[in-house]
Each structure stands twice: as C-alpha cells, then as structure tokens.
Design a protein with these regions (language model features):
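Short hydrophobic beta-strand element within catalytic cores of glycosyltransferases
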Residues: 116-119
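A charged, aromatic-enriched C-terminal amphipathic alpha-helix characteristic of glycosyltransferases
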Residues: 140, 153-183
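Acidic anion/phosphate-binding donor-loop and adjacent secondary structure
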Residues: 4-19, 172
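Conserved acidic donor-binding segment of nucleotide-sugar-dependent glycosyltransferases
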Residues: 131-140, 147-154
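Short alpha-helical donor nucleotide-sugar binding micro-motif in glycosyltransferases
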Residues: 86-91
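Nucleotide-activated donor-binding/catalytic signature segment of Leloir-type glycosyltransferases, i.e.
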Residues: 63-85
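Conserved donor-binding/catalytic core segment of Leloir-type glycosyltransferases
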Residues: 13-36, 42-48, 54
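Aromatic "clamp/platform" in nucleotide-sugar-dependent glycosyltransferases that forms part
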Residues: 99
C-alpha cells in the first residue's frame, strides 16, 4: 500500500508568485550531504546565479563546512510542517537530487504545493515526477536543467505536478486500500 498525502493541507494557491529553487534534507554528516545530492544543488546554483536557492533542514552540521556554497544559496534550519508548506507554496522548483532515495515525502509535498519537480532518476523519484518536471542522471545533465528552469513555465505546470500526486498518492486512497486489506 503506497504512502498517501493530504492534498487539503498541502495545497496550492494560483495567485502566489512563485520563485526560486528549494531542496530539503536532514543531514548529520558529509555522507548524507553527498547522498542527498547537495553537491549537485550547489553546482546548479552556480549555473543559475540570478535565481535564489534554499536548503532546508540543516541539523547537526553546517553544510558550508563541506561545500563551498554559491552566494545565491541560503541555508535555513529545520522547519515546522506549516513553515514547509509556506516555503513550498512560494517556491517555483523543488530539487530532489538524491543518489539513494525511496519515495521522498518532501518531493510529493512540494509537488502538491505546486512546485515543479527536478529529480534524479533513482528509485521512487521518477515514479513521483513522471512527466511533470525534469529527471536527470548525472552532473552532465545540469545544462538541461538550466534550460528547463529558464523555460516559460506557467500555472499549468504547477497544477500538473499537484494533480499527479493527487492521482497517485492521495491519502484517501491509502485509507481505502488499508480498509480493504483489513476487512
């Protein structure tokens, strides 16, 4: 039974002017920084110097101890669920550059809030993104991501990401599947 997400809470307001690129990762050592693809996020920021980038979730260590962060990257600490919702709602792109990942909750929550997804082609990430954003294999693909970010994306793209998660992972569908498996 798949994970489910509450589309009523993780909502999207079409009137909000969305900007920037966001990623979220809880990390406690250099290994996690690499697994979560923060080095690729940093490299992408270097290729898009006029766009703001945000890393959410810094924990026991400072990511800047391990990466020479680009000046357009802001690192903020762990956020509450409501704070994450507000960040997602105001952000245009969500980056999930993990090298090892199941089905990322933060990616699905961001897509429900209208973020256009950018993700690596590992495990559950392509299944979540489908054709609503852009998928990449390696650092060599970053130029394609730059073109994608600079393209003219409108409300349709934001809604498309949201609708995919509702269709595949709506919480009410999960509840129904659980009920059927029990009774």
């Amino acid at each position: 039974i798949n994970t489910g997400y509450d589309a009523r809470f993780w909502n999207y307001d079409e009137s909000v002017q969305k900007t920037g690129v966001l990623t979220a990762a809880f990390f406690s050592d250099k290994r996690v920084i690499n697994i979560k693809g923060l080095d690729l996020f940093n490299k992408l920021a270097s290729l898009l110097p006029n766009i703001s980038f945000t890393i959410v979730g810094e924990s026991d260590i400072s990511v800047s101890e391990f990466l020479n962060l680009q000046p357009n990257i802001k690192v903020i600490g762990v956020q509450t669920k409501s704070q994450m919702k507000e960040l997602y709602q105001n952000t245009k792109f969500y980056f999930q550059g993990s090298r090892l990942e199941g089905l990322p909750n933060s990616l699905c929550e961001a897509m429900l809030c209208g973020c256009v997804p950018i993700g690596s082609k590992v495990f559950g990430i392509p299944d979540a993104i489908g054709n609503t954003g852009i998928l990449f294999d390696t650092e060599k693909d970053l130029e394609q991501i730059v073109e994608f970010v600079n393209s003219d994306l409108g409300v349709y793209n934001f809604s498309k990401a949201r609708n995919r998660i509702i269709k595949k992972y709506d919480f009410s569908k999960r509840v129904e599947k659980i009920k059927k498996s029990i009774f």
